[in-house]
Amino acid sequence: QKQDAQKERKELQELISEIAHQMRTPLTNLKNYLDFLSEEIEKKGTEPELSYLKAIQSSEEKIYFLTEHFIRISRLEHGLIQIRKEERDLLKTLRNALGQILDQAEKKEIRFEFELPEKMHVMHDANWLGEAIFNLLDNAVKYTPTGGSVHVSVAQWEMYVEIKVSDTGKGISESNQASIFKRFYREEEIHNQPGVGIGLYLTREIVTQQGGYVTVESQVGKGSAFSIFLPR
C-alpha cells in the first residue's frame, strides 16, 4: 500500500508538472511576442495601438498570475510541496514581501506604518511565508482607498509570533468573515476589484502547513486586520 501511495503521488506530481509546463510555455511565448511588439509600437505606433497593446499585456499578466496560483494550490492541496522550515530572520522575509508591493502602494499614495522589533528569528519557510505575507499586503493595498494607510506589525507572544496587516478599507461584514478563506470566495461588495478570491485561501494553506494559523478582525467602514500566527 505504501508503494502504491508513493507511485500515485509521483504520478500526480508528474501530471501537475506537465500541466504547468503546457500552460506556462504558450504564456511565456505570448509575453515575448508582446514585449517585441511593444518595442516596435513605442517607436512607430499610434496612441490607440499602444493602448490596445497595454490592454493585451495586462490580460496576459493576469492569466499568468492565475496560472501560477492554480498550480501552487494544486501542489499544496495534494501534499506535493515540501515546506522547508529553518530558523530565519522574519523581518527579512517581511521586507522582501513589502518590496513587491511598494509600487502598487505608491500609485495609490498609501502610506505604511510599522511597529516592528529590532530583530525576530522564527522557524519558517521564507519563500512560502513571503508569499502568504504578500497576499495580505496585496489585499490591504487593494482595498484601502487612495491616500489611506496600512499598518504592519510583528509581535511576540508566549506560544506564537504574530504578523499583523491592518488596512483602512471598507471592512468585511461579520457574516462573511467565516467564508473569506474559502477558495474563490469574494464578497458581493468587492466584485469591482481585480482577483478571483484565491489569495486568502492560499495564505491559509501555506501558514497551516507551517504549523500556524490565520485570523481576521474587521468592522464594516473601519477596515480589516489579518494576522498570521507562527509557533515560536
Feature map (PLM): residue ranges:
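Short beta-strand/loop element within the Bergerat-fold HATPase_c
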Residues: 147-159
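Short conserved segment of the HATPase_c
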Residues: 172-184
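Conserved catalytic submotifs in the C-terminal HATPase_c
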Residues: 84-87, 106, 111-121
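Short helix-loop "hinge" at the ATP-lid/N-box region of the Bergerat-fold HATPase_c
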Residues: 140-141
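Acidic ATP/Mg2+-coordinating residue in the GHKL
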Residues: 167
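Conserved glycine-rich
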Residues: 212-213
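Short alpha-helical segment of the dimerization/phosphotransfer core of two-component systems
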Residues: 58-63
